[in-house]
Structures are given as structure tokens and as C-alpha cells.
Amino acid sequence: GVEDVICFTYGKKGNREAEISRQVAEALGYQWHFVEYTNEKWYACAHTDDMKAYYSYAGNLVSIPHIQDILAVKELKEEGNIPENAVFVPGHSGDMLAGSWIPQDYDKPQAYTFGTFLEESLKKHYSLWKWNEAELGPLFEGKIRKSVEDISVHDNESCANAVELFNYNERQAKFIVNSVRVYEFFGFRWQIPLWDAELIDFFLRVSLMLRLKQVLYRDYVVKKLLVGAFEFLQDLECTTDLKANNKDGTRNELILDLKYFLSKIPLLENLGKKVYTLRRIHTAYDTHPLAWYGVIPRDSFLKIYSGRENINSFVGLFYVNEVCPAPLNGVVKKYFTDAERILSAI
């Protein structure tokens, strides 16, 4: 296999993703580094001149900056754990190609129209703050229409195609892949092999039923990748749920079916959402596996956080404040439904 490989991951100590990363690196015999993330580290980093410079460099007036890797790359470089000529190879956007962004219920009998696509896109990509629908709804819908132009939506396959096209154009290209700016910021090069043109062309020809729930990807990994010299990787925790007919796969199907059932009973669905949201509000600051809500003080976070926000909600405000600080208060007051609460905290 490939030699001279350094693997790294990051987050709170003991987080599940870090453990999976360690297992895979050790199984393949690669060097592995873990960078611990804490609320305190994030707060210290968020208010430095370096972070302000990174916002300007990475956002480039196109997207909010992607900050997830910045603590790790900074610390690895400062401690000499990666050579100056290192080339970073992240996995963007393998999950997207395999079908991870297609709504899981697109194999169910339901209406599939352009309106369905608009609703899915607004829910997924315009939900980080509670905004004034009368003011911003037409604007956001116009942006979505412009991105996909005159795409036809008439069944589940064409609706999934529209969902993915908008995601490719607006999320993957402008935000996810733009995360490589952090490597450049610290003087490193990068490659994104999963955006190879041949691979993209192949998945453009894959039918919905093989993309939905990542059916083709899972089957390929088990039957073609984790075989021969790499068959032992099938026993790692992170790969066991790829196997056909295993209990985890069955459990996931049951969860999806339960969610679909609850969606048809609004009272039960709303009750479940309220219970889940209350729990998140009281635990998110200290339990997030990346600890990154530490970019703001705990008391400010608890004033603002309603359960719908994520780190990009806050980074978006920070970024707007960096590029045009004077109008921020006016923008928040005009377009945010909880403007006074948000402004009092920030």
C-alpha cells in the first residue's frame, strides 16, 4: 500500500470518531496523532488575530469559513508532527457521492414535485437561525431556483437529482471542499481524490435505488475493498455496520421506519422533537464531540441556543461581523425573529 502516511484526528478525549480513526490507522500500520479539543482551546483560538486572518482568507466573500480542522492543523504544525512538504488528503465528498444527502424516505410513496425539492432544501440549508419568512423566504427560494435552473422534478429520482445538484453547487463546492483553505493557510498542499472526474461521472449514472441509503457504496466496500489482505478490517467497529443483514443495519432500518411513521402523526412527532431539543439545549455545550461551542462563553451560548443552531450559525455571525461590522445589529434586527435575545448575548 501507500507508505509515508500520517493519520490524525481530533475532538474531545474519548469521542467515538477518534477511536474509529485510531483503529483504522493502527490496523493499516500508519502513524496516528490525536489533537484534543476543549472549550478553553476554542475560546482562546476564536479571538486571535490569526483566526480573524483565517476568516478573511477562507471565507473570501463566498462562504462562511470552515473551522473544524484549524486547531488540529495548527497544533500538529507547531509541535512538528507533520513535515513541511506534507500533502493533506481529506475524504471530501465521498459520502455525498454515495448518496448520503438524499432523504432516506425517498423510497416511500409520496408526492415528488419541485415544491418537495424546495422544502427539503430550505429545511436542510437555511435552518441555522429562525429567520423572518416574509422577508427572506422569497429571497432564499430565488437562490435555490437560480442554482438548479430549470431542472425537471416529477418523481423520486428526479427529486433526488435536484436535491443533490443544489447540494453540489452550494454546499460541497463552496463550503465542504472550501475547507481545504485551512491547509493552505498553514502552508500545506492538498489533494481531494474523491472528486476525481471519472468517479463523479460514474456516480452520475448510478440509479437512485443504489444511491439511496448508500446501497452501492456499502455493497462495494464489503465485497470489493475489505477482502484479501484487508478482510480483517471487516471486524473493526466502524465497518461492521456495512455488512449485509447485520443487526445494526436492521436497527437503522427500524429507526428510519419509525421516523417515517411519526412524521405522519404530527402530535407525536412534535412531542418527540421538543423532548430531544430540551435535552440538546442543556447538554450541547459540554458534550459536543468537537467541543467547539467553546468559541463563545457558556452563558452567552445558553442565551442564544435553541436547538436548531450549530457551530456554523455562530461562525456565520462572526464572519459577517469581520467583513462588515457596522451593519450587523441592523441585519440581525431586521431578519432574525429572536434578534434581541441574540444581540444581548453577542
Regions found by a protein language model. Give the residues of each.
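ATP-dependent adenylation/pyrophosphate-handling site
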Residues: 1-28
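Short, solvent-exposed loop/turn segments at secondary-structure junctions
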Residues: 13-15, 39-42, 93-97, 102-103, ...
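A conserved beta-strand->alpha-helix junction
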Residues: 18, 22-57, 97, 147-151
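Structural element of the ATP-grasp superfamily
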Residues: 21-25, 76, 221-222
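Short secondary-structure boundary/capping segments
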Residues: 24, 49-53, 99-114, 207-210
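A conserved donor-nucleotide-binding helix/loop in the catalytic core
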Residues: 64-80, 165, 176
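Active-site adenylate/phosphate-handling loop in enzymes that bind or generate adenylated species
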Residues: 72-139, 182, 187-195
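Adenosyl-5′-phosphate
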Residues: 83, 127, 131-346
